[in-house]
Design a protein with these regions (language model features):
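Acidic glycine-/aspartate-rich tracts in secreted/extracellular proteins
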Residues: 74-76, 189-194, 204-205
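Active-site-proximal beta-strands of protease catalytic cores
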Residues: 182-190
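Disulfide-stabilized, aromatic/cysteine-rich ligand-recognition loop
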Residues: 89-103, 108-113, 171, 194-226
Length: 226
């Protein structure tokens, strides 16, 4: 049995599962516009209970089956498909809701990735998978300082350092998962401090040695530029 743990809920830094309620304890996940209007929960308490249950089920599933599935491509308006415009300019709540609609059948649930799942995926890639560097992803991600050009698509060679469609380059993948490193930031369910959710992986505008696949940071869940 593998023991999987994360930082303790109700602490002030990186942690999950937990709510983000602002320094006044009345914002973000306690704002009805978000927890009810967008996510459909009756109360912040119901939202917290759902997060706790989902997290426990995720951990139990990993321990039982030895792993989990990740969408092969970044999220687009059409879902998880190749060759689509990455879905950006949406806040955390909108993307969290979108992630719950991606299951192919009623026997499968789709969720936004948890922080621990992101870390486990990076750990697998660096140690057991294609053994790519997760602390400097300039050689396999779409960053501002990545090396060389991307693959040719539709007869045109496009350089690193600009946003591309999902699954654009065969060089930008690890274990058949595209754009874990760069292209666009990825939101997770991990909470940060009193006012943030965590995003990971860097983007096309970031240095891949400073913002690699393993990088994570907290930002306002109401922001919409990721």
């Amino acid at each position: 049995t593998v023991t999987i743990s994360r930082s303790t809920p109700n602490t002030t830094d990186y942690r999950e599962p937990d709510l983000v309620v602002g320094s006044d304890s009345t914002s973000y996940d306690k704002n009805e516009s978000y927890y009810k209007t967008i996510l459909g929960y009756d109360s912040p308490k119901a939202m917290a209970e759902a997060f706790t249950t989902d997290y426990a089920n995720m951990i139990a599933s990993i321990q039982k089956y030895g792993g989990f599935y990740i969408g092969r491509y970044e999220l687009s308006k059409e879902g998880v498909q190749k060759g689509k415009a990455t879905l950006t300019n949406k806040n955390w709540y909108e993307l969290y809701k979108k992630c719950t609609t991606l299951n192919a059948s009623d026997k499968v649930e789709s969720k936004m990735i948890w922080g621990i799942q992101w870390d486990l995926a990076c750990d697998f890639i660096s140690k057991k998978g294609e053994q790519k560097s997760i602390i400097n992803s300039t050689t396999w991600g779409n960053h501002s300082n990545s090396t060389g050009n991307a693959a040719v698509m539709d007869g045109e060679t496009k350089k690193y350092g600009s946003k591309q469609v999902t699954g654009f380059s065969e060089y930008w993948k690890a274990n058949n998962i595209y754009d874990l490193a760069g292209n666009c930031w990825e939101w997770t369910q991990e909470a940060f401090n009193t006012n943030g959710r965590v995003y990971c992986g860097g983007s096309y505008g970031n240095d891949g040695s400073f913002y690699p696949a393993s990088y994570r940071y907290g930002s306002s869940p109401t922001g919409s530029s990721y």
